[in-house]
Swiss-Prot record:
Mg(2+). Can also accept Mn(2+). It is an enzyme of class 2 (transferase). One of its GO terms (cellular component) is cytoplasm. It catalyses: acetate + ATP = acetyl phosphate + ADP. Homodimer. Keywords: ATP-binding, Cytoplasm, Kinase, Magnesium, Metal-binding, Nucleotide-binding, Transferase. The active site is at 146 (proton donor/acceptor). This is Acetate kinase. It comes from Streptococcus agalactiae serotype V (strain ATCC BAA-611 / 2603 V/R). Pathway: Metabolic intermediate biosynthesis; acetyl-CoA biosynthesis; acetyl-CoA from acetate: step 1/2. The keyword Magnesium applies. It comes from the Bacteria. Mg(2+) binds at residues 8, 383. Substrate binds at residue 89.
């Protein structure tokens, strides 16, 4: 029985899921956190069991070794030969990659070259790819790009209104992100609605620590909220989302703590969003607790968050000339009914009627009333499964 492992590498983490394919059965999953520190944590979940170790893991190569040792130690695999494919989530594929790609030296170099488009993600992905190639050089290795799904956008959508030389010479344009998630939930929505995806107009809202909204026309991305980098779009957990770009030189000139544009961008990526406005947390659960206690900063952060998401959904309702369904997914999208309620409350003009009971009780699927003109669905995303499927598809070529 062949097994495929889906990898999502962060700068100090390695999240993984092992599948039996083509059955798509999850055999085990886990995460290695705090890579590079002396109290790294390796967690493995399998057969309703959970094993956790505190280790000294210096880099991603050692993390991969620990992961593989854990799989054999717990009898999840007998030997490494059972693993016939590995798929790596890569956030930025730029214009190099319109679909998933088999890994070779050139692909790894291109992933690293594109780090400017996803500085929080691509370097870590490259480290994970190199680690697996070093330890398991003979298995099929595939890169699955968050940006690939959005390559169907047209020039009038992906180009910025700046001199064309910045696109032709430097490839400055909208690329989007979370494409694997948007593609998965759109496919699942079509199944739940009982209609071909090629007939549907959908708005998919990936609302986690990162937030992106996509307009999906007949199965293709025609617009999305993230841009040249994943910093663009609505307000997020620690990211600002869209701001007036003139703010950047203004802050460099006036705040001595922000010495250059890179420092401002770092602040916009890591210290802004819910965290920046609330002053306390990037976690919606903490923000909602602040609503209950009437913390004015939490209330403000929440209201800005709702406002920004609502505006993007309204924008894409116009772009699509209406929609058959709006889909919420990812951490907050799946688990924050108050957020869903307040976003949809501002869209009632479009004939959307939420069912309060279905929404509040964590109902996955349609959470609208039967006569709602636009359906609202809650669909758990499964990027790891999409990655595993692409590995199998490319193995078969």
């Amino acid at each position: 029985m062949s097994k495929t492992i889906a990898i999502n590498a962060g700068s100090s983490s390695l999240k993984w899921q092992l599948y039996e394919m083509p059955e798509e059965k999850v055999v085990a999953k886990g995460i290695i956190e705090r890579i590079g520190l002396k109290d790294s944590i390796s967690t493995v979940k399998f057969d309703d069991k959970k094993d956790e170790q505190i280790l000294d893991i210096v880099d991603h190569t050692q993390a991969v070794k620990i992961l593989l040792e854990d799989l054999t130690k717990h009898g999840i695999i007998k030997d490494f030969n059972e693993i016939t494919g590995v798929g790596h989530r890569v956030v930025a594929g730029g214009e190099y990659f319109k679909e998933s790609a088999l890994v070779d030296d050139k692909v790894v170099e291109q992933v690293e070259e594109l780090s400017a488009l996803a500085p929080l993600h691509n370097p870590a992905a490259a480290a994970g790819i190199r680690a697996f190639r070093e330890i398991l050089p003979d298995i099929t290795s595939v890169c699955v790009f968050d940006t690939a799904f959005h390559t169907t956008m047209q020039p009038h959508t992906y180009l910025y209104p700046i001199p064309q030389k910045y696109y032709t010479d430097y490839k400055v344009r909208k690329y989007g992100a979370h494409g694997t998630s948007h593609q998965y939930v759109a496919q699942e929505a079509a199944k739940q609605l009982g209609r071909p995806l090629e007939e549907l107009k959908l708005i998919t809202a990936h609302v986690g620590n990162g937030v992106s909204i996509t307009a999906n026309y007949h199965g293709q991305s025609i617009d999305t909220s993230m841009g040249f980098t994943p910093l663009a779009g609505p307000m997020m957990g620690t990211r600002s989302g869209d701001i007036d770009p003139a703010i950047i030189p203004y802050l460099v000139a006036n705040d001595p703590e922000l010495e250059d544009a890179a420092a401002v961008v770092n602040m916009l990526n890591k210290q802004s969003g819910l965290l920046g406005v609330s002053g306390t947390s990037s976690d919606m659960r903490d923000i909602e607790a602040g609503l209950q206690s009437k913390d004015p900063n939490a209330v403000l952060a929440y209201n800005v968050f709702i406002d920004r998401i609502k505006k993007f959904i309204g924008q894409y309702l116009a772009v699509l000339n209406g929609a058959d369904a709006i889909i919420f997914t990812a951490g907050m999208g799946e688990n924050a009914p108050l957020m869903r309620q307040d976003v949809i409350a501002g869209l009632s003009w479009f004939g959307i009627e939420l069912d309060p009971e279905k929404n509040v009780f964590g109902y996955f699927g349609d959470i609208t009333k039967p006569d709602s003109k636009v359906k609202v669905l809650v669909i758990p995303t499964d990027e790891e499964l999409m990655i595993a499927r692409d590995v199998e598809r490319l193995k078969a070529k």
